[in-house]
Swiss-Prot record:
Source organism per UniProt: Homo sapiens (Human)
Main subcellular localisation: membrane
CDD domains assigned: IgV_TCR_beta
Complex and partners: Alpha-beta TR is a heterodimer composed of an alpha and beta chain; disulfide-linked. The alpha-beta TR is associated with the transmembrane signaling CD3 coreceptor proteins to form the TR-CD3 (TcR or TCR). The assembly of alpha-beta TR heterodimers with CD3 occurs in the endoplasmic reticulum where a single alpha-beta TR heterodimer associates with one CD3D-CD3E heterodimer, one CD3G-CD3E heterodimer and one CD247 homodimer forming a stable octameric structure. CD3D-CD3E and CD3G-CD3E heterodimers preferentially associate with TR alpha and TR beta chains, respectively.
Gene that encodes the chain: TRBV7-2
Stretch forming the signal peptide: 1-21
GO biological process: adaptive immune response; cell surface receptor signaling pathway
Protein's UniProt name: T cell receptor beta variable 7-2
Length: 115
């Protein structure tokens, strides 16, 4: 069996609306084999126009990956390689895809939203 990678997907809130609803991420955790593709989904707080993806590797600080703001072109400056991609459909749900996973991809992946 190939090397297994652990993708802990956590959620992070940058503010919350008056109802207390928060960012939703799925899956909440993901274990995969090296070389497999992984897709992570983020559903932001209703009404929030900005969406961010970060990751945190063991013993490291948060690392910015990508930022979406409304209908503007995303800031992809933090994506570590062409194996990483993200999209946001309809100004709402975002999907982060990691193709051909490697050992160094093992991290906590976080999504946040804001006004």
């Amino acid at each position: 069996m190939g090397t297994r990678l652990l993708f802990w997907v956590a959620f992070c809130l940058l503010g919350a609306d008056h109802t207390g609803a928060g960012v939703s991420q799925s899956p909440s955790n993901k274990v995969t084999e090296k070389g497999k593709d992984v897709e992570l989904r983020c559903d932001p707080i209703s009404g929030h126009t900005a969406l961010y993806w970060y990751r945190q590797s063991l013993g490291q600080g948060l690392e910015f990956l990508i930022y979406f703001q409304g209908n503007s072109a995303p800031d992809k400056s933090g994506l570590p390689s062409d194996r990483f991609s993200a999209e946001r459909t309809g100004g709402s749900v975002s999907t982060l895809t990691i193709q051909r996973t490697q050992q160094e991809d093992s991290a906590v992946y976080l999504c946040a939203s804001s006004l």
